[in-house]
């Protein structure tokens, strides 16, 4: 079994963006699936199950695990909170039963993209170095003085079993900020490999170049196509030409 589980959480409002992300993965892999990573496609309870989305993901990942959330919450933040908590409980159940055996889980949304072809290996190396329960992009704001790590992050598969307060989610605050003090107590690490550009649009190429130079391999938060466009120019096109474009350091 692969060491990393990539989780893409989807509700009906971002099916189109999720499909574009899956298409980008297919273009990056170009017929040769990623190594060391499986995919889990998590639908909110009321979300349709698009055939194209699953077919595209299956081109990039040797294993795709569709899962429909059992929670009924809708709206923000209750909807995504319920999906994440239910998904993580399912992941823990599958590991407790020994059916799965991943080292870590990358929980993501439709506005998260890889900036390099070997992102699974780079994230696994970062996870090994971090030696923590949560690893991702830290922000100083949130519900608690410790700030929070954005929810597009790496988690131990058994995270929700480590503290009884992780068994449910708030309906008034996003889960990653609401539960931040617990994650901090359990152990978290701010890693450069995962970065967040919150609600960003029209991002210029030099921003992605700088992120890559600073070791970012996974980016969340860009709400338009500019991140995907950059990946197509700098990863997909470069692979077809037989080389990679890397920004100069210094």
Where are these regions (language model features)?
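Short beta-strand-to-loop acidic/aromatic patch adjacent to the donor-nucleotide binding site
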Residues: 99-113
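N-proximal low-complexity "stem/linker" segments adjacent to membrane-targeting elements
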Residues: 1-26
């Amino acid at each position: 079994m692969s060491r990393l589980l990539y989780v893409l959480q989807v509700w009906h409002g971002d099916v189109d963006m999720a499909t574009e992300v899956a298409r980008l993965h297919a273009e990056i892999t170009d017929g040769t699936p990623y190594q060391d990573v499986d995919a889990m496609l998590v639908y909110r309870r009321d979300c349709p199950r698009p055939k194209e989305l699953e077919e595209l993901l299956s081109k990039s990942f040797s294993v795709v695990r569709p899962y429909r959330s059992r929670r009924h919450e809708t709206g923000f933040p209750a909807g995504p909170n319920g999906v994440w908590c239910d998904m993580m409980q399912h992941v823990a159940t599958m590991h407790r039963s020994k059916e799965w055996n991943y080292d870590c889980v990358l929980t993501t949304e439709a506005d998260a993209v890889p900036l390099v072809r070997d992102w699974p290996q780079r994230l696994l190396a970062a996870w090994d170095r971090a030696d923590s329960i949560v690893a991702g992009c830290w922000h100083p704001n949130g519900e608690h003085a410790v700030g929070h790590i954005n929810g597009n992050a790496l988690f131990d598969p058994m995270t929700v079993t480590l503290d009884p307060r992780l068994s449910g989610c708030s309906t008034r605050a996003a889960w990653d900020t609401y539960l931040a003090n617990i994650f901090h107590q359990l152990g978290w690490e701010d890693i450069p490999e995962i970065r967040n550009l919150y609600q960003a649009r029209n991002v210029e190429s030099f921003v992605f170049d700088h992120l890559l130079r600073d070791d970012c391999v996974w980016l969340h938060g860009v709400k338009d196509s500019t991140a995907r466009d950059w990946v197509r120019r700098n990863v997909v096109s470069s692979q077809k030409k037989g080389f990679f474009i890397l920004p100069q350091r210094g």
